[in-house]
Every structure is written in C-alpha cells, then in structure tokens.
C-alpha cells in the first residue's frame, strides 16, 4: 500500500475487485458535503440571524434572490440525502464488518455525531414554528443533567429562554461545524486507506486488487449521477416533501404545536427518547442510541468478519433495519396508544441487536464448529 496520500486518493489506490455498490456511498457522502457547503454559503450571504428577520430572510431568499428557491431547496433536501446515504453507509459497515477497522469506524461515528449537531442547528435557523419548538424541547433535555443541567441550558440559550442570542450562536455553530466535518472526513479517508477497504466476502483482498481509477471511479459515477438526478427531481417537483407544515408559520412562543417533532432523520432517536416516561432516562437513551455504535468493534466475537455467511446475525440485522423504520414512523405519531407501546417495543429491539452481537458470534462459531 503506497503512503503518498494525495496520489493514493486519486487513482493509484489499490481496491478489492469484488466490492459492490454498497461501497459507493462514501463518494456520494463526499458529494453531498460539497453540495451542502456550496449551497450553504450562498444562503448564508442572504440570511439574517435575528429572531425578527430570520423568517422574512428565508422568504426573501426564495422569492427575490435569483435561484434562491433552488439553493434553499437543494440545501434542505440535500441534508435529507446526506442522512439517507450516511445511514446506508453505516448499515453496510455493520453488515460487512467494516467496524473491525477500529480507527476508521470511530472517526466515522464522530463524524455522524458532528453531522447530527450541524443538522439540528440548521433546522432551527428558519425560525419557523416547528424549528423553535423542536429547539426548545431538545435543548431543554440538558436540564435533566443533575446539578449542572439548568446552568448548562441557560448558558446554551444565552438567557432564560430561546431568544436572539440562541439563534445567533446556532447560526455561528451551523456555519463552523461543516469545516470540522471536512477535517474529520479527511481523517476518515486517510485512516481507511491505511488499512484499505473490506469486501463482501470478508477475505484478505491483497491477492486480487485493481486501481480505483478507472474501474471503481466509473461505478461510483453511475450512482452519483442517479443520486443527483433523484435530488433534482425532488427539488423540482416535490420540494416540500420533507417539510413540516408548521414550519411555514413564524415561530410563536405563545402557541405550542399539537405535535412537536424534529426532522425525519432524527425521528428514530426522538422515538427512543419518547418511549421512556422519565426525562433523565429518555435523555440517556437518546444519547446511548448513537453512542452504542462506538462499542460495536469490541463486541465482535464471530470468526467470520461479514454477515454474508452468518444467518443468525443476518436475521438480527434485518430486524434492526425494520426496527429503525418502525421507530421512525411511530415517532411521527401522537403520544397515545398504540404508538407508545410500539415505540417502547422497537426501542427495546433496537438496543437488543447491539447487545446480542457477542452472543450470536459465539453461537455461530459453535454452529460452524470453529473453536
């Protein structure tokens, strides 16, 4: 493996011949990041971080700025595409055992957390009704921290409630964090290319490698083209598909929406939070739903790396996928039966998958007579 990183990244990188389409999502994520930074810059030029003007400045961008509507929709829907790609990317890592490359996995999960923080701050910026109340509910979870909670919340808000200082600092954070994401992405790619990608069989690919360019670069380009086509179809014909109707009204602290919920890509974590009636317990479960991903490399006990030849793990993996979808759906519903029970069952199943990894590994070793 050559150690000239710049050359290695562009073309000379030796890659296994048998990596499938599931390995394309890294380059798609890089494209999403570039798109978000570019559209975000043009939006920031016209945006005003003031509670009296923020909502009006978004209307000004969509109505008066040339192609402002396209920039705004590309940025909002691009965020959804970003999360679709990152969730598939993580699912592929779980299925094919990519997490055994520990440094790459750890940097990737850190990237996910940074991305989620950036997206949350961005959701608050339009200062719509749902933006305001989602920010109030989520930041208010800090008060669940014993002793420090109230002080931390006041410090984050810049006052005793969400107000102008909160919006200003959220805009500053939303602007600066993408640069942290770019730095972490570079680190992620360098760490990956130290060891090299895994492959669907989980075998050592050193005996059969080909240059990344032109073989895999053209394969990446196909899916990239399809993603951009899909993105522009949504932007052109269904621009409000991911928007909440409440967010078309300006934030009003005196009127609470009937059902407060964040963007769809946070709903699985929000569903886990809501499934626990205790505030501190819910906040801990919310944090653990992401943090548990850090533990996976240390829980792998199977002798085979991917799930390709491990039927029990496959069953649990697809249960996790269906659980993720179900909990996302349940979190869009009001807090009433049967949705409370569905959320609690799916939250339990979600954590069961991660806790069952070592047990399933041992069982599969026994089934295959591997000592």
UniProtKB/Swiss-Prot annotation:
InterPro entries for the chain: Cyt_b/b6_C, Cyt_b/b6_C_sf, Cyt_b/b6_N, Cytb/b6-like_sf, Cytochrome_b, Cytochrome_b_C_euk/bac, Cytochrome_b_N_euk/bac, Di-haem_cyt_TM
Subcellular compartments: Mitochondrion inner membrane
One Pfam family in the UniProt entry: Cytochrom_B_C
Binding residues annotated for heme b b562, in chain numbering: 75, 174
Cofactor note: Binds 2 heme b groups non-covalently.
GO MF term set: metal ion binding; ubiquinol-cytochrome-c reductase activity
Cofactor dependency: heme b
Gene Ontology biological process terms in this record: mitochondrial electron transport, ubiquinol to cytochrome c
Transmembrane feature ranges: 25-45, 69-90, 105-125, 170-190, 218-238, 280-300, 312-332, 339-358
Superkingdom in the source lineage: Eukaryota
Binding site for a ubiquinone: 193
UniProt: heme b b566 binding residues: 89, 188
Its membrane topology: Multi-pass membrane protein
This protein's UniProt keywords: Electron transport, Heme, Iron, Membrane, Metal-binding, Mitochondrion, Mitochondrion inner membrane, Respiratory chain, Transmembrane, Transmembrane helix, Transport, Ubiquinone
An annotated GO cellular component: mitochondrial inner membrane
The family this protein is said to belong to: Belongs to the cytochrome b family.
Record's subunit section: The cytochrome bc1 complex contains 3 respiratory subunits (MT-CYB, CYC1 and UQCRFS1), 2 core proteins (UQCRC1 and UQCRC2) and probably 6 low-molecular weight proteins.
UniProt function note: Component of the ubiquinol-cytochrome c reductase complex (complex III or cytochrome b-c1 complex) that is part of the mitochondrial respiratory chain. The b-c1 complex mediates electron transfer from ubiquinol to cytochrome c. Contributes to the generation of a proton gradient across the mitochondrial membrane that is then used for ATP synthesis.
Protein name: Cytochrome b
Species this chain originates from: Simalia amethistina (Amethystine python)
Gene name per UniProt: MT-CYB
